[in-house]
Amino acid sequence: MLLLPFQLLAVLFPGGNSEHAFQGPTSFHVIQTSSFTNSTWAQTQGSGWLDDLQIHGWDSDSGTAIFLKPWSKGNFSDKEVAELEEIFRVYIFGFAREVQDFAGDFQMKYPFEIQGIAGCELHSGGAIVSFLRGALGGLDFLSVKNASCVPSPEGGSRAQKFCALIIQYQGIMETVRILLYETCPRYLLGVLNAGKADLQRQVKPEAWLSSGPSPGPGRLQLVCHVSGFYPKPVWVMWMRGEQEQQGTQLGDILPNANWTWYLRATLDVADGEAAGLSCRVKHSSLEGQDIILYWRNPTSIGSIVLAIIVPSLLLLLCLALWYMRRRSYQNIP
């Protein structure tokens, strides 16, 4: 665990209250997915994330990082970035080779997939906690705590055997320790500061209502769409007056291409119960001015046609009467 210097806390949390002043991401992590088809073919994908926002990719062909934002390097120099890229290149190549070499010893049956996540998180009060977890086929396999390999119960004897093997490689464990407990915290602070304008921006949501597929005879599905908001935390609820409707179903918060978010909230009701319902949206960007949209039964196509045709016919009738009356006056000698 690392404690932030006071000066950096003041930059990230200018209001003095870290729990409320900083509403952007608070963690950085890299994700590795390695797929092993057979003893000679493997593919690894990598990416870097601030919470749910991707800021790095990995080009497997060139073995270089892809920086998705101008500030994705944080405060690291080009030399430091090049050194890290070299570490990851060597690691990815060596990891695939070692796994294939030891697959038989660990009774690994092709094809299989290994996932890994490693990073660090800024906690309230300024502490930074680092983490590393590995999974095999979607099941927890091991973690690193206090620079030691800890097998997961789901990994069984295979995970225990792996940890016993890896701790013999002191050079690898020292590199992991440096990356987790020194490099990652320093990078996290730098990138949060470098990307501060983007990460702490406030973008107001847009909201609209629609009807979804009918859930059954005599019933309606009301849908409240909320899109384009940032940061991610949002509160959406179907209401009747001030009473929350407990049947409200929230979907997953999904990313838009422009680093904003989308959410939909649905409510199934009987035909006669939709009147008086509203969708309420709360978000930090609204500064307490909640969005409230009231449900109105959609107008039928027939009503729309009548609303257009009837006035048009009346207008034509008036014009015809005016024209006939004008002609009749002209025929008077």
Curated annotation (Swiss-Prot):
Q: How does it sit in the membrane?
A: Single-pass type I membrane protein
| Sequence motif: Internalization signal, positions | 329-332
GO CC term (a single one): cytosol
PANTHER family named in the record: MHC CLASS I-RELATED, T-CELL SURFACE GLYCOPROTEIN CD1B
Q: Supply one GO molecular-function term.
A: exogenous lipid antigen binding
Q: Where in the cell is it found?
A: Cell membrane; Endosome membrane; Lysosome membrane
The glycosylation sites are N38, N75, N146, N258
- Domain of life per record: Eukaryota
Its job = Antigen-presenting protein that binds self and non-self lipid and glycolipid antigens and presents them to T-cell receptors on natural killer T-cells.
Q: Which residues lie on this side of the membrane: Cytoplasmic?
A: 325-333
Q: Where in this chain does the record put each Ig-like domain?
A: 185-295
Q: Which residues form the signal peptide?
A: 1-17
What is the name attached to this protein's record?
A: T-cell surface glycoprotein CD1b
Q: Which residues cross the membrane?
A: 304-324
Q: Which GO terms describe its biological process?
A: adaptive immune response; antigen processing and presentation, endogenous lipid antigen via MHC class Ib; antigen processing and presentation, exogenous lipid antigen via MHC class Ib; immune response; positive regulation of T cell mediated cytotoxicity
Which Gene3D superfamilies is this protein grouped with?
A: Immunoglobulins, MHC class I-like antigen recognition-like
